[in-house]
C-alpha cells in the first residue's frame, strides 16, 4: 500500500483510482476490518482516504460503535478531527470494526463479527481499534484513526505490526468521539511507519474550543521537525516486564541493545507494580463507562425495543437487547463501584492511586527523557484464547500507565517471534512531548530496517 506521505502528492484523479482500488480490495477481503465497503458510507469528500474508527462522528454516516444499540444512528455533525483532516487534504474513507464501545482488547465483541489479524487469520488483531490496525497492516488502508483508552491504539498496532500513537490527553480534540471513559479517551493515528504517524498526528492535533479538555496549544509540526540524530536518556522498568513472554523479553533486550548502539543512555527506574495499575484503571474506566452509556436508553437515538408496555420496560429491553455481554459487565461493575456503600472503598481510592501514579511518572521524567516498555505481554493470541475477562484485561498491563497519567506513548514494531508474529515496543514521553517520541522511534525504525510484510 502507498504510504500517507506518498499519497499526499497524488493528483485528484490518482486519488480516485486509489480509493476505487481500496474499495475493491475491501470487498474481496475476509479480514472484516471494515464494517462495510467504504463506498457504501457515501465517502465523497476529496482528499487522501483515511480509515475512521466507528466511534468517531462523520456527518451523514451511520456511527454505531459496533453496537446494536446505536443501529440506525446517523451522525449530525463532524468530529473535530474529521474537520482537521479536511483542512489537511485528507478525508474519511470507510469505518473500521472495533470492540463494542471500545471495551475490549481483541475486536471479538463487535456486533459486526470478529476482525482477523492479517499476519495470521486465526489470531486476534488486538483491540479495541483492531479494524484500524488490521486494515493498515493488511494493505487495506493508507492510514487510520483509532481511539486509545487503555492501549486500544498501541496494542493492536503491536499485534498487527504497524505504528500506533496515543497523544497526550488534551492534545487532540475529543469533540465528536463517542465517549467510553472521558478522562482516558484520546484519538490518534495508526500508520505504516513513523513518518506517516507524524504527518497524521500533526493534521489532527491542536486546540479546540468545543472540547473543554483540549489543551490551548497550536497544532504540532512534528513531521517538519523529525530528527533522527537526537540522543535521549531512556528509563527501563525491569520489574515491569517480568510478566512478558520469553519472546517479548528477548525482543525487549535486543531493542535495548540497538538503542545503546545508536547512542542513547539507558538507566533503570521503578514504578508501582503494573498489577495495581490494572485494578485502578478498570475501576475508574468502568465507573465512567456506566455514566457515559446511561444516555443510550432507546428514547433519543439508536435502537428501540418493540412491544413494550411502559417506560421502564422500554429502558430495560432496549439496553438488554442493544448491549453486548462485555459492555453489560462493565456497566454493572461501574455502577457497583459508584454505589453509596462502595464509592469510598473503590472509586475514591482508585482516583487517589491514579494521582500517585501520575506523580511517580513525573518524578521519573525529572531525570529522563523517555520510558521504554513492551506494548503487550505476548504476541497476538488465538481467537477465544482468553479464559476469562480478567485474563483479557491483563493484556493491557503495559499500556494503561500512559492513560492513567495522560502521557503520550507510541508503539513501534521491532521484531517477530518464531511464528512470524509482530512484536511491538513502546516509548512513553513527558506530557506534550510527542516530538521526542517520534524522533526516537524514527531513528530506531531506520536502524532496525524492519520489514514485516
From Swiss-Prot:
TM region(s), chain numbering: none
GO molecular function, one term: glutaminyl-tRNA synthase (glutamine-hydrolyzing) activity
Enzyme class name: ligase
InterPro entries tied to this protein: Amidase, Amidase_CS, Amidase_dom, AS_sf, GatA
Catalytic activity: L-glutamyl-tRNA(Gln) + L-glutamine + ATP + H2O = L-glutaminyl-tRNA(Gln) + L-glutamate + ADP + phosphate + H(+)
Its EC number(s): 6.3.5.7
Catalytic residues identified in the record: 53, 128, 152
Signal peptide: none
Assigned GO CC terms: glutamyl-tRNA(Gln) amidotransferase complex
Keywords of the record: ATP-binding, Ligase, Nucleotide-binding, Protein biosynthesis
One GO BP annotation of this record: translation
Subunit structure: Heterotrimer of A, B and C subunits.
HAMAP family: GatA
Function: Allows the formation of correctly charged Gln-tRNA(Gln) through the transamidation of misacylated Glu-tRNA(Gln) in organisms which lack glutaminyl-tRNA synthetase. The reaction takes place in the presence of glutamine and ATP through an activated gamma-phospho-Glu-tRNA(Gln).
Similarity field: Belongs to the amidase family. GatA subfamily.
UniProt cross-references to NCBIfam families, sorted A to Z: gatA
Protein name per UniProt: Glutamyl-tRNA(Gln) amidotransferase subunit A
Amino acid at each position: 500500500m502507498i504510504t500517507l506521505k506518498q499519497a499526499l502528492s497524488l493528483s485528484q484523479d490518482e486519488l480516485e483510482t486509489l480509493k476505487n482500488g481500496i474499495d475493491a480490495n475491501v470487498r474481496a477481503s475476509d479480514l472484516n476490518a471494515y464494517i462495510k465497503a467504504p463506498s457504501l458510507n457515501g465517502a465523497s469528500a476529496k482528499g487522501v482516504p483515511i480509515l475512521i474508527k466507528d466511534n468517531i462522528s462523520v456527518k451523514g454516516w451511520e456511527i454505531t460503535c459496533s453496537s446494536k444499540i446505536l443501529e440506525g444512528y446517523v451522525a449530525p455533525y463532524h468530529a473535530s478531527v474529521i474537520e482537521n483532516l479536511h483542512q489537511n487534504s485528507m478525508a474519511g474513507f470507510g469505518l473500521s470494526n472495533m470492540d463494542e464501545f471500545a471495551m475490549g482488547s481483541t475486536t471479538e465483541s463487535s456486533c459486526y463479527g470478529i476482525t482477523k489479524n492479517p499476519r495470521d487469520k486465526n489470531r486476534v488483531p488486538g483491540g479495541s481499534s483492531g479494524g484500524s490496525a488490521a486494515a493498515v497492516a493488511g494493505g487495506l488502508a493508507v492510514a487510520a484513526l483509532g481511539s486509545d483508552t487503555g492501549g486500544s491504539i498501541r496494542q493492536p498496532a503491536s499485534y498487527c505490526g504497524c505504528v500506533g500513537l496515543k497523544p497526550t490527553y488534551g492534545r487532540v480534540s475529543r469533540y465528536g468521539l463517542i465517549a467510553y471513559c472521558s478522562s482516558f479517551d484520546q484519538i490518534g493515528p495508526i500508520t505504516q511507519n513513523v513518518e506517516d504517524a507524524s504527518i497524521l498526528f500533526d493534521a489532527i492535533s491542536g486546540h479546540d474550543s468545543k472540547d473543554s479538555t483540549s489543551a490551548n496549544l497550536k497544532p504540532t509540526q512534528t513531521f517538519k521537525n523529525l530528527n533522527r540524530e537526537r540522543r535521549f536518556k531512556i528509563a527501563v522498568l525491569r520489574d515491569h516486564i517480568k510478566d512478558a513472554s520469553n519472546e517479548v523479553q528477548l525482543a525487549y533486550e535486543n531493542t535495548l541493545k540497538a538503542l545503546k548502539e545508536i547512542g542513547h543512555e539507558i538507566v533503570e527506574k521503578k514504578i508501582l507494580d503494573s498489577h495495581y495499575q490494572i485494578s485502578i484503571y478498570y475501576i475508574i474506566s468502568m465507573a465512567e463507562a456506566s455514566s457515559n452509556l446511561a444516555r443510550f436508553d432507546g428514547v433519543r437515538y439508536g435502537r428501540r425495543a418493540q412491544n413494550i408496555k411502559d417506560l421502564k420496560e422500554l429502558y430495560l429491553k432496549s439496553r438488554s437487547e442493544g448491549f453486548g455481554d462485555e459492555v453489560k459487565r462493565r456497566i454493572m461493575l461501574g455502577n457497583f463501584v459508584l454505589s453509596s456503600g462502595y464509592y469510598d472503598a473503590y472509586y475514591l481510592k482508585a482516583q487517589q492511586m491514579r494521582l500517585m501514579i501520575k506523580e511517580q511518572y513525573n518524578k521519573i521524567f525529572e531525570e529522563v527523557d523517555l520510558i521504554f516498555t513492551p506494548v503487550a505481554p505476548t504476541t497476538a493470541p488465538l481467537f477465544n484464547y482468553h479464559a476469562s475477562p480478567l485474563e483479557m484485561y491483563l493484556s493491557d498491563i503495559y499500556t494503561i500507565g500512559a492513560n492513567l497519567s495522560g502521557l503520550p506513548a507510541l508503539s513501534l514494531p521491532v521484531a517477530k517471534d518464531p511464528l512470524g508474529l509482530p512484536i511491538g515496543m513502546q516509548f512513553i514521553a513527558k506530557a506534550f512531548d510527542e516530538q521526542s517520541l517520534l524522533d526516537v522511534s524514527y531513528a530506531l525504525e531506520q536502524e532496525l530496517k524492519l520489514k514485516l510484510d
